């Protein structure tokens, strides 16, 4: 499972700066759920090939209302969700009573905690950190989050228990250095046909992992119990921590599934609870582990930013998507038309995803969801050969030629599969990285239409074909040199 790192500390110690530094390496979800998660922000970060979730808690001022009250509202929940807690202090401001109060509380909690002294740039770091030894820590880590100094080493140490090979990967230069990181996206990973085949083999003959996600009280639990009830699977509560989703194997129409329940499967008598527990971490973990994501939306409420944030995270993770608009029963025709218009307006960027209008409570339309789930999974995992992809690429360029770049037309040579779930098409050619985004979108839509891909995002990667003779001096043979001398002599004689 993907590890979770929580940033805890009093206000203005640099938690948000470190949070932004860690999450900007990917265009990842930064979800803010006011009222539900208080002031906590959740983001996805990556070090090398390893993903993790980072939580930015609100500032804790233990000297005013007491640590217990403050943490109970925002940070205590984050600490429970986390695998590692980074307790941040300000090296320039020195030790404060708030720091001492927070440290005293953290000592009572059985959670891996690391003391991080921030803002040590431009000062004597050891002298600035000396007072913090009073907090009774075994070791501390000095960083400058604003510049990224010490951040990579800190994260390596924090994640080391979860990824034993993380430090060895760093020695091989595989871990991205977060120091003075630019805002521009990291270079795209190069994919080979061998990578694609290996990816496909892992997916074949595996049960489809289906994650049901959505904001609180949209009907996730009702839908989960409806699905399990139809399949006559025993509904049970599995023990685990608050951040663990429940994995329920099931079978439908001869196809095996693993249902990832983020809401918590309830016994039938408890389905109608009015308050539903909601964990962002649980949802993000479920999306990362799923093949297909079923996003449940409440038809009786407008599409919210939370809905879009969850959808955006699923897209960034490359997951297949099916949309279920719940509580459709009982709405009059005028309201239904308005809901459909709102869906078209706000969800136009996922026009490849099937939308189902259902009633989880009464079971209307629930059975058809699995038709779209299978279609999306099939689209994400169908093998496509190099010859087919190259032919589609040629057809696309014939219908609409690539643009000119510095007086030369971009040339696309061939295409092959680079991966599955999501499908990745790798296109080789000259100056391909100079292609404008509009033409890249054209190619993506052309491949989607030609391959009849539904329910899954598709990614296009571009690789420049290197010229083997570039920067090589062209040495002439002896016969070529004699011919050149004769030609030059003839030119001189003609001038005379």
UniProtKB/Swiss-Prot annotation:
Signal peptide range: none
Gene3D superfamilies the UniProt entry points to: 3.30.300.20, P-loop containing nucleotide triphosphate hydrolases (3.40.50.300)
Pfam families for this protein: KH_dom-like, MMR_HSR1
Binding site for GTP 2: 214-221, 261-265, 326-329
UniProt entry keywords in alphabetical sequence: GTP-binding, Nucleotide-binding, Repeat, Ribosome biogenesis
Stretches assigned to the EngA-type G domain: 3-166, 208-381
Domain KH-like: 382-466
UniProt-listed InterPro entries: AAA+_ATPase, G_ENGA, GTP-bd, GTPase_Der, KH_dom-like, KH_dom-like_a/b, P-loop_NTPase, Small_GTP-bd
Role description: GTPase that plays an essential role in the late steps of ribosome biogenesis.
Protein name: GTPase Der
Organism: Vibrio vulnificus (strain CMCP6)
Gene: der
């Amino acid at each position: 499972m993907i590890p979770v790192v929580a940033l805890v500390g009093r206000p203005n110690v640099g938690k948000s700066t470190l949070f932004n530094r860690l999450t900007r390496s990917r265009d990842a979800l930064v979800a803010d759920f006011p009222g539900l998660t208080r002031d906590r922000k959740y983001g996805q970060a990556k070090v090398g090939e390893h993903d993790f979730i980072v939580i930015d808690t609100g500032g804790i001022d233990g000297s005013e209302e007491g640590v217990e009250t403050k943490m109970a509202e925002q940070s205590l929940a984050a600490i429970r969700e986390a695998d590692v807690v980074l307790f941040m202090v300000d090296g320039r401001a020195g030790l404060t009573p708030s720091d001492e109060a927070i440290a005293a509380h953290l000592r009572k909690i059985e959670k891996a905690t690391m003391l991080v002294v921030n803002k040590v740039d431009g000062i004597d770091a050891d002298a600035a950190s000396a007072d913090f030894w009073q907090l009774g820590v075994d070791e501390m880590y000095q960083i400058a989050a604003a510049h990224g100094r010490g951040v990579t080493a800190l994260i390596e140490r924090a994640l080391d228990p979860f990824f034993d090979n993380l430090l060895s990967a760093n020695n091989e230069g595989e871990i991205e250095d977060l120091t003075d990181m630019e805002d521009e996206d990291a270079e795209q990973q190069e994919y080979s046909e061998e990578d694609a085949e290996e990816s496909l083999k892992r997916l074949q003959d595996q049960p489809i992992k289906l994650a049901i996600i959505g904001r609180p009280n949209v009907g996730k639990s009702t839908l989960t119990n409806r699905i399990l009830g139809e399949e006559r699977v025993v509904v049970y509560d599995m023990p685990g921590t608050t951040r663990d989703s429940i994995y329920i194997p099931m079978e439908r129409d001869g196809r095996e599934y693993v249902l990832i329940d983020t809401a918590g499967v309830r016994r039938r008598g408890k389905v109608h609870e009015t308050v539903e527990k909601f964990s962002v971490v649980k949802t993000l973990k479920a999306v990362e582990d799923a093949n297909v994501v079923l996003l449940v939306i409440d038809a009786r409420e407008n599409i919210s930013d939370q809905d879009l944030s969850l959808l955006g995270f699923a897209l960034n993770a490359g997951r297949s998507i099916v949309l279920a608009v719940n509580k459709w029963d009982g709405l009059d025709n005028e309201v239904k038309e308005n809901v459909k218009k709102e869906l078209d307006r706000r969800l136009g960027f996922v026009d490849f995803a099937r939308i189902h209008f259902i009633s989880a409570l009464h079971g209307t339309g629930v059975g058809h969801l699995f038709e779209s789930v299978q279609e999306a999974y099939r689209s994400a995992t169908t093998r496509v050969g190099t010859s087919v992809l190259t032919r589609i690429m040629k057809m696309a360029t014939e219908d609409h030629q690539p643009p000119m770049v510095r007086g030369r037309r971009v040339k696309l040579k061939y295409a092959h599969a680079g991966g599955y779930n999501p499908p990745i098409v790798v296109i080789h050619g000259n100056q391909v990285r100079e292609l404008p985004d509009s033409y890249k979108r054209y190619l993506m839509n052309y491949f989607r239409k030609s391959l009849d891909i539904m329910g899954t995002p598709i990614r296009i990667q571009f690789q420049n074909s290197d010229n083997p003779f570039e920067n090589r001096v062209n040495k002439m043979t002896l016969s070529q040199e004699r011919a050149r001398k004769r030609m030059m002599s003839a030119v001189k004689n003609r001038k005379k």
